[in-house]
Amino acid sequence: MLLSGMRESQGTEVSLRTISTQDLRLLVSFAYSGVVRARWPGLLRAAQAALQYQSSSCLDLCQKGLARGLSPARCLALFPMAEAPGLERLWSKARHYLLTHLPAVALCPAFPSLPAACLAELLDSDELHVQEEFEAFVAARCWLAANPETQESEAKALLRCVRFGRMSTRELRRVRAAGLLPPLTPDLLHQLMVEADVPGQERRREPDRALVVIGGDGLRPDMALRQPSRAVWWARAFRCGVGLVRTVEWGQLPALPAPGRFRHGAASLAGSELYVCGGQDFYSHSNTLASTLRWEPSQEDWEEMAPLSQARSLFSLVALDGKLYALGGRHNDVALDSVETYNPELNVWRPAPALPAPCFAHAAAILEGQLYVSGGCGGTGQYLASLMHYDPKLEKPGTFLSPMGVPRAGHVMAALGGRLYVAGGLGETEDLLSFEAYELRTDSWTHLAPLPSPHVGAASAVLQGELLVLGGYSHRTYALSHLIHAYCPGLGRWLCLGTLPRPRAEMPACILTLPAVQHIALVPTPHQTKPAG
């Protein structure tokens, strides 16, 4: 108001008749410090004050803080501010949270206060992410039970947003058993189910970013022998059919140069440039690669860049502060402790401070701008449970933190919601299904719901607030996997999202911005008529 050219900016004094002492103190403090010190409820009040008194920089800061701490109850608390100008970005994130956590949201005491039109819009959205359509019915039933004054016509309009035609026979039996609470009659539910007697419209989610899977160890088209893959796929949409049937629409990007590679690293810079380096192009240790490839949307094919100084496989490649870091790995059956960093502007790899000890088949992730390395195999082949903070700016860059609950290698690690998540891999004697989360503030690990099936040498990515684990193999059976499992922290469970176009293992996955790949044509995938897993 005082700096935007309004009439008050020209006066010698301004009368603020409605501002509270608390709001004035907060805004003046922010004007001098650029900081808002508050927990989530305080941030919400600060955002309301910043919105009312047009402090755009304070509002932006509050929105970032509010978006990081979303929960079912907090999303419902944001709804009264949903249509306020300037809060579109925050409400978009809150709406997405509601769509992906509806079963948990329906259990909140504030859920019945959600307007019927808003709930109907959520239930009718293709973006609604539920394990089965019965969960959408349960949410509608809970809301109607808490709002008995709802007119029958309004209740019918709300229930029509539930896609009964997508339900399996088992789900429909559960719907009939649950019924509707008075004053709504059983005839209303029967009428809606008769109307939906034909298969209903599937739910089709199109992510705002592209999941890309690069190469890997697979099978030849005749399924006779294993063969390193050249294929590069990206997921265009996730589809939910009848019951538990899940499929993924896959597109293809330009293939890797022959003969393909696996046990390699891949990372994205700026969300649009994809780098692939190292790995193996065959199954002998002498087939370890040092080459680096780059692809961006303006290119029809992969471009060869400066090679790694040290050929390596089974290593981690991460992007940090605009550079790439290749950590550890294996060459000629020898574990490596060396680290290299790539400068994309100079197209050169340079040595970085070495790891405290050699390791391969480990995992790495970036959490709050810091690089962490977990597990793997040591120089003598022993399985590691370590977690290390690696700071390339230090002469001795490795700081060991609290170890994982179990030693593992060939696992995945990703940062999500301020925590590090570690899943799957191989233990000292068998496949690991265990799943752990690391809390940085307390330097402690928590065991969570285990993986539904083995994923050794799998790819991982974080997409739309979920941890995705893709492909891999089982050490017990040596069978390759094509399953994609997703973990949603707010619901504490794993869901199967569908399958890869082909079973694959020992490959990486990356996230690219959608405009970078959306012009690439889709490739057909077989129609799936049974649950993926």
UniProtKB/Swiss-Prot annotation:
SMART domains to which the protein is assigned, alphabetical: BACK, Kelch
Cystine bridges: none
Renumbered ranges of Kelch repeats: 210-258, 273-322, 323-369, 371-418, 419-465, 467-514
Name of protein: Kelch-like protein 33
Pfam families attached to this UniProt entry: BACK, BTB_KLHL33, Kelch_1, Kelch_KLHDC2_KLHL20_DRC7
Domain of life: Eukaryota
SUPFAM superfamilies assigned to the protein according to its UniProt record, in alphabetical order: Kelch motif, POZ domain
UniProt keyword terms in alphabetical order: Kelch repeat, Repeat
InterPro entries named in the record: BACK (IPR011705), BTB-kelch_protein (IPR017096), Kelch-typ_b-propeller (IPR015915), Kelch_1 (IPR006652), KLHL33_BACK (IPR030609), SKP1/BTB/POZ_sf (IPR011333)
